[in-house]
Amino acid sequence: MKQKFSSMIDRYTHQQLRIGLVSPQQISTWSKKILPNGEIVGEVTKPYTFHYKTNKPEKDGLFCERIFGPIKSGICACGNYRVIGDEKEDPQFCEQCGVEFVDSRIRRYQMGYIKLAYPVMHVWYLKRLPSYIVNLLDKPLNELEDLVYCGFYFARPIDKKPTFLRLRGLLEYEIQPWKYRIPIFFTTRSFDTFRNREMSTGGGSIRQQLANLDLRMIIDYSLVEWKELEEEEPTGNEWEDRKVGRRKDFLLRRMELAKHFIRTNIEPKWMVLCLLPVLPPELRPIYHIDEDKLVTSDINEIYRRIIYRNNTLTDLLTTSIATPEELIISQEKLLQEAVDALLDNGICGQPMRDDHNRIYKSLSDVIEGKEGRVRETLLGKRVDYSGRSVIVVGPSLSLHRCGLPREIAIELFQAFVIRDLIRKHLASNIGVAKSQIRKKKPIVWEILQEILDDHPVLLNRAPTLHRLGIQAFLPILVEGRAICLHPLVCKGFNADFDGDQMAVHVPLSLEAQAEARLLMFSHMNLLSPTIGDPISAPTQDMLSGLYVLTSGNRRGICVNRYNPCNRRNYQNEDNNYKYTKKKEPFFCNAYDAIGAYRQKRIHLGSPLWLRWRLDQRVIAAREAPIEIHYESLGTYYEIYGHYLIVRSIKKEILYIYIRTTLGHIYLYREIEEAIQGFWQGCCNSMLPAGIRVSPG
């Protein structure tokens, strides 16, 4: 028994979880088990849970101990006890009640099944988008729904046999004259034989159509039709062209779906259920609050309705001879609706409710959503070596770095710090090392920073919808309690700085650290894996910052000077509005302008004149200056809208100044450094080994 449980949770044996289709034989294998006396159990046939007097599970019910195992380890329903795993104890099951003497944990994974009296459609593959059954059968969804819920009949094609019905496909038996004309030619039994032979409805008709599909022929025919549509030229009619485009997209989806079925060895008819799995009892518990009160899972109540309706349909099909067809069809529809409520309550209309008008919680509700089993229990559970905090912007960080608060870092990397303290003989044992960490000695932070320089961490923001939701960073210690993040990586996380929280995880094994370095670093995930567009692009706060940085007095000097709102900026001591150099300073280079800003002599958006090397061919010859100022030495200034030319007496160009702001200078320098770094990296990659291009 211990080996059986260890194999269930072995991480090397079970490394992934996949939701997909299984065959009825596989469901039977999961559920059936052979008792030591040769009896086969596993089918749930009774809609009962516990006996109201003995408070024990009903035999062949939803909590049957013969099917799902004992409630208490080694104790059968009769109360007898056997030592688990003792081969000397014989027999290994109770001959009176048929319960095996095994560990009670078996009730957490042992499944049962319900043998359906009539095939039932799996609603996920019919109503969810995209509808796989619609894609395979190439029929409208409303027609298939009418067929599944017994609103239409399907005329069966019978090969090499004489048929009464010459039509093929759907027929509405209830409205058309078939209902009154066909039975005239038959007796009651003969008509039942004819109807079962040439007409079908419900999930059985869908199952028959899916079983008759040839997936390879579907691929061939779809490919031929797609090529024919591709060769057609546009008609000019927008509606017709869109219709052709939708048909081509449908054919591509159909071919991909057929290829997937062939590649995974899945048969399409498995989308119609003949055996309905019953979850283990521990996953749908029932609790006793008081002596008279029980609290049970909604899934148990839905299972009970399914068993009631299935047993009723079985009786109608087997025991009753002259049962009206309408009654059988109605019961098949009720069974289909009950299974729909179990899988996805409310997807097909009005949801199933209890006596207090409360909607039952289906399997889809248990699995999906933020509070579902996957996101809350499997993905959102607390794990060791992980933390969580609010994110704030870190504009000075490199793209592959993040700021980790000291309080979080010392907790996550405490084991690593203790190891290094002992290895460097700074602490004699673990207790002394922990004492130094509690006292926050300076040597602790030095060792911690050394560890962080070579150990990546993983940052994750829920929900993790694609692989860029988890990325690797090299952490640096920061003050405060918030995680600092570079704004360029926010798009991959779909994060912003309005209170979002992110989780930090420490990869422990060498394999995990290698994967983080080779595949998950943020500077290695610059493009979207789906469409190839840049994922590290300025958004939100960065765009606002760039706007503020370059939103100084960007308009030309003429517009600013003669604008009444800006006249006070140019008014001099003589109360006129002519140009004066005192208002807008001149700088020989960008370093002088930055120095003046640091000395608080100018502002970030203040207009200024910067000496610039400008190609004279760029200057328009026909452009006339706005003003010309002459100096006492003969030099003069030609002032244009966005630049200024200093000429000598001989009209030679001495200097050229451009009108800009300090924000534009900062942005230009960043772009220039980035281009130079990119060019240097490209040159180094093309040069032979040992030769490198130095900056400058």
From Swiss-Prot:
- List the SMART domains hit by this protein, alphabetically: RPOLA_N (SM00663)
Q: Name one GO cellular component term.
A: mitochondrion
Query: Which biological process annotations from GO are given for this protein?
Result: DNA-templated transcription
Catalyzed reactions? RNA(n) + a ribonucleoside 5'-triphosphate = RNA(n+1) + diphosphate
Presence of the UniProt keyword Kinase in the record: no
Q: Does the keyword Manganese apply?
A: no
Q: List localization entries.
A: Plastid, Chloroplast
Q: Which Pfam families match?
A: RNA_pol_Rpb1_1, RNA_pol_Rpb1_2
**Broad enzyme group:** transferase
Detail which positions bind Mg(2+).
D496, D498, D500
> What does the note accompanying the cofactor annotation read?
Binds 1 Mg(2+) ion per subunit. Binds 1 Zn(2+) ion per subunit.
EC number(s) per entry: 2.7.7.6
The family note in this entry says: Belongs to the RNA polymerase beta' chain family. RpoC1 subfamily.
Please describe what this protein does: DNA-dependent RNA polymerase catalyzes the transcription of DNA into RNA using the four ribonucleoside triphosphates as substrates.
HAMAP family hit by this protein: RNApol_bact_RpoC1
Q: What is this protein called?
A: DNA-directed RNA polymerase subunit beta'
Q: Which organism is it from?
A: Guizotia abyssinica
